[in-house]
Every structure is written in C-alpha cells, then in structure tokens.
Amino acid sequence: GTGRFWYVLTENPKRHVYACDNSQKMIDIGLQYREKQLTKKIDTFKASAFSLPLSDGYVDNIFCIRLLHHIGYSEDRLKLLKEFHRVSKSTVIVSLWVDGNVKAWKRKKLESNRTKRHYQNRFVIPQRTIEKEFNEAGFTIKAYLDFIPKYAMWRTYILEKNENISC
C-alpha cells in the first residue's frame, strides 16, 4: 500500500519493517509522501502476497490490512494465508470485512438490489468461513477486534502460527 501504517509499525526503533505491494506505483506513492526520517527505516519491495520472495520464517510478524476483503474465492484466500504461514515466524495480523453486523446486513441488501456486475472487488466474508480458513492454513485465532462491535464490518484478527501444521 501507500504506507498508511508505517508510522505505527516503525515506532519501536528495534523493529525492522519490510513493506510490500503488488504495485510499485503504490509503494512509490508511500515513499514520496512520507518523511525521509520514516522511509529510511523501511525496506520496500514489489511482490505478490501470494508468492513472497522471502525464505521460510523470514519475518516475525505479517501485518496485512485491507487486502483480504478483496479476495472473493476461498481457495485464493487459503493460498494467501498459507504463504503468510510459510513466511512468518509466529504471528499474522489481518483485517477484513466480516458478517454479523449492521453494515454487512446493509451491504448485502444493497448488493441484492444492484444489477449483477461481472466483476466485484470487495466482499463481506462470513466469520465462520474465514475462521475455518485460518485454521486450514495453520493458524489459531489469538484475538480479534471489531472496529465498532455489532455495527461495522471491519474486524482485525491476530493469528498465531500453529507449529504442528506445515503448509
């Protein structure tokens, strides 16, 4: 992305941050509009999150915000999560849209009234579905946080790598 969370991620001076996006243009925007003091703390690279050019267990944590709700097919989300399992040593933090709240209900109602489009790029994922996928990819849910409980679709999960599973 464009570095929206880089400030938070670099608060700890001992933390080394790698930022990755499938679009070099997005990375360049982040580098252009953030202070040099910040960007010098971050190594950026262009890559697909489905195939990261990193060795197994290369990073302590993966912070993946505002990506999963763009992936409509379970098999694609599972592939992504398995790649995160491979590359992370311990934890993964992800955010996405989930059901079970007012906004998801309103969105479903809105979508049912729309003319069907060939392409859709944002999805409300059922909680039960995504949590099953986390498990299949080798993660245990350590915690989750709803942005505004029972109202907003945004949920952030902290996933812990289950060492008994090799993906």
What are these regions (language model features)?
Residues R66-H70:
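Short catalytic micro-motifs in class I SAM-dependent methyltransferases
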Residues S88-V92:
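Short glycine-dipeptide loop
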Residues G1-S51, E75, K79, I93-C167:
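Class I (Rossmann-like) S-adenosyl-L-methionine-dependent methyltransferase catalytic domain
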Residues K79-E83, V87:
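Short, conserved SAM-binding segment of the class I
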